[in-house]
Design a protein with these regions (language model features):
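Structured non-transmembrane domains adjacent to transmembrane bundles in polytopic membrane proteins
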Residues: 32-53, 61-139, 360-558, 588, ...
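Generic start-of-chain signal for non-secretory N-termini
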Residues: 1-3, 25, 33, 47
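Short hinge/gating elements
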Residues: 23-26, 367-368
């Protein structure tokens, strides 16, 4: 019955997504920001002008790209006739005549124009193409023409890698396929639900990829934990139904708590007050919840059907699942217990070395200059950046729109315009400052400032800060006028600054929530405190590796990123929530085993050794699976997805090795019985009992036809 219900849910979810017609958008909104205020003022003063633009770039290596011919005139008219194009500029030509472009003003964000719009652009520019000139689309059109990620290929690679690891971990096809099948069903349902949600609210284009990546990784891991415990109970002599029931009560309970922790961290992104980021967290949360539900219902149902045939179709002799018998991990845990200070120092040294580059972290926006070579967006970017002359250079790919509110001004508009134009032109980092023109009603001045550097350059960010906080207020303050920088580049820099201010808030919310959850779960103060501190170490080390690979460019070419780029502004916030949540997964599984031993009467050191020995192999297998899944998504052409994939993979590796296998056991041995201290009400004595089912709990059998056992 459970399996049938899941198949019905699968069919309904897929059908619902097809009927919903989801649409994704990377539009960000920062109500109250200076760029948003300036954009709204521009729209009111310019009869609905949006500030959304695009470039149609023409190139002729031998010159004559901007020559006035019948082909250029026909193309200009065809571009002006396109839907949602409000105006087309005169052809701007470089000094050598090899490159020229039209700037198109749009009524809507180009991203919303639909996948068929590039074909319309091709038809509109057919005349200049036939004249032998190269045509590329850039500016705001890069959102429309940028190549989509090949998520299906990444998912297949991730599934294949997971299957190999599961076969090595379990030794049999049956045991390996069950967690994988459960994860696959969960991912399809989760993605379908995300699609249904996207039909009614704006979700980022990265949302489906993020949901698939997280859902596949945690789905396989959760299924692995339940299957491992099921096999352990079979070895102990339980019949299959009882083994399935006990697996749910122990590992299943931990799966639900781990999923709750991950979801808490992801939903905590809403605390930033940024809808764009909060909804990315929502998409990932949906996939985590579905994966956890499948692990505690669908996987046990499959285990109940397979029963003792779990080791059929063996590819090697199956490894016996034990409750901590003497093996290599038991000997390793004993070694850690003998020299905890040495292991702690070594682990901290590794974390410190990986975290050192964190001090150089620079947030920014990744522009079309990082798109794949040969793509139309990258070609347009490079042609404009490499050409010389007014309107060309790197900054022409991301100019600022200057908007001045003259309401209440005590000086004439032309005097204010002249003074501000001179100040803008004299500001270091400005490549060109266009004339400021008054609106029809004389209440607004507008103009364009072109930075000397590209949109993702640190110099452009510095110029933005100088203009917003010094040049504009210092120049306009005496005239009682107010200036703003609007346009996509200004909006992205405002977005970056907002995230920088709110990231500490998100970190605080997640830390407090996770500490509270673990405190209630383990009835301890030091255990949750240690957990949140060590998980912060994992996140910091992951950030450091991101800086080295992407910002410094060390090894970025292996991932298809051939230029150093800033860290996309929202990636650290997303990574913190995800890495912290996944780190808590392994923390909960390890501490659950340690707490069971402590609850059973073992001493602290003995409990730590027992828990480590019981969970080390399965945590290692789970980490390898998660790492393989994440790295498979590094093949995406989207740099942001590459960043998330690499950052999450590194975070999992660090957490499952240095943190979980070295720092956690060594600190717990050093802290001794203080690990388990928890304030009690007067008159109560004895050990604080973690809220975890132990191995001795009498759990009713699980049957595939009757769902979860009653607790």
């Amino acid at each position: 019955m459970v399996i049938v219900l899941w198949l019905v849910a699968l069919g309904c979810a897929v059908a619902g997504q097809h009927l919903a017609h989801p649409a994704y958008s990377d539009a960000t909104s920062l109500p109250g920001s200076q760029s948003d205020t300036g954009g709204a003022l521009l729209a009111r003063a310019s009869s609905g002008a949006t500030g959304y633009t695009g470039l149609v770039v023409v190139h002729a290596p031998t010159g004559g790209a901007g020559a006035a011919t019948g082909a250029t005139a026909d193309t200009a008219r065809a571009l002006a006739a396109l839907p949602d194009v409000s105006s087309v500029s005169e052809l701007v030509t470089s000094t050598d005549g090899a490159t020229a472009y039209w700037r198109l003003d749009f009524d809507v964000r180009p991203k919303t124009l639909g996948s068929g719009y590039p074909a319309r652009l091709d038809r509109a520019t057919a005349a200049v193409r036939q004249a032998g000139r190269q045509v590329a689309y850039g500016g705001g059109l890069d959102e429309l023409t940028r190549p989509a990620g090949n998520d299906r290929a990444a998912e297949l690679v991730g599934l294949s890698a997971a299957l190999v690891v599961l076969l090595l971990a379990f030794g049999s096809v049956a045991a390996a396929v069950l967690p994988l099948a459960s994860a696959l069903v969960a991912v399809v349902i989760g993605l379908s639900v995300v699609g249904i949600v996207a039909a009614s609210v704006d979700l980022a284009t990265a949302a489906p990829t993020l949901a698939a990546m997280i859902g596949l990784g945690v789905g396989v891991d959760y299924g692995l934990f339940v299957t491992t415990r099921f096999r352990a109970h079979l070895v102990e002599g339980d019949d299959p139904d009882r083994a399935a029931g006990r697996a749910i009560a122990s590992s299943g309970h931990a799966v639900l708590l781990a999923a709750a922790t991950v979801s808490l961290a992801l939903l905590g992104l809403y605390g930033a007050g940024l809808t764009f980021i909060g909804r990315l967290g929502l998409a990932a949360t949906i996939s985590v919840v579905v994966a956890a539900a499948a692990a505690v219902t669908l996987v046990p149902a499959g285990l109940g059907l397979v029963g003792r045939r779990i080791d059929r179709l063996a590819v090697r002799p199956p490894v016996a699942e034990t409750s901590g018998a003497e093996d290599g991990w038991q000997r390793y845990s004993a070694l850690v217990a003998r020299r905890p200070a040495l292991f702690l120092a070594g682990g901290l040294a590794v974390i410190a070395a990986l975290s050192l580059p964190l001090g150089a972290l620079r947030l920014g926006h990744i522009d079309a200059g990082a798109d794949p070579l040969g793509s139309t967006s990258r070609t347009a970017y490079d042609l404009v950046a490499d050409a010389r002359g007014p309107g060309f250079g790197p900054g022409a790919n991301g100019p600022f729109t200057v908007v001045v509110d003259l309401h209440g001004a005590n000086q004439p508009a032309d005097a204010i315009a002249a003074k501000l134009s001179a100040a803008l032109g004299a500001t270091p980092g400005v490549g060109a400052a266009g004339p400021l023109r008054a609106s029809a009603d004389g209440t607004v001045l507008t103009g364009t400032v072109t930075p000397a550097s590209g949109p993702q350059s640190a110099a452009t960010g510095t110029l933005f800060e100088q203009l917003v906080h010094h040049t504009l207020p210092d120049t306009l303050g005496g005239a009682h006028a107010t200036g703003y920088l609007a346009g996509p580049t200004a909006g992205q820099l405002d977005f970056r600054d907002t995230i920088s201010r709110r990231l500490p808030l998100i970190i605080g919310l997640v830390l407090v929530g996770s500490f509270t959850l673990l405190m209630l779960m383990f009835r301890s103060l030091l255990i949750p405190l240690k957990a949140v501190v060590l998980n912060l170490f994992t996140t910091g080390a992951s950030y450091g590796v991101l800086v080295v690979v992407f910002q410094w460019g060390w090894g970025g070419g292996l991932l298809g990123v051939h230029e150093a780029v800033p860290i996309e502004s929202y990636v650290p916030m997303m990574m913190f929530a995800i890495v912290f949540g996944l780190s808590m997964d392994y923390e909960i599984f390890l501490l659950s085993a340690i707490a069971e031993a402590w609850r059973g009467g073992s001493g602290n050191t003995e409990a730590v050794g027992s828990g480590l020995a019981r969970t080390a192999r399965v945590i290692t297998s789970a980490a390898v699976i998660m790492t393989a899944v994440f790295l498979s998504f590094a093949s995406s052409p989207t740099v942001v997805i590459k960043m998330l994939a690499v950052g999450l993979a590194v975070g999992v590796v660090i957490d499952a090795t240095v943190v979980r296998m070295v720092l956690v056991p060594s600190t717990m041995v050093l802290l001794g019985s203080a690990n388990w201290w928890f304030p009690r009400r007067p008159g109560r004595a004895g050990r604080a009992r973690p809220v975890l089912p132990g191995p001795g709990v009498d759990v009713p059998p699980y049957t595939a036809g009757h769902g979860m056992p009653h607790q």
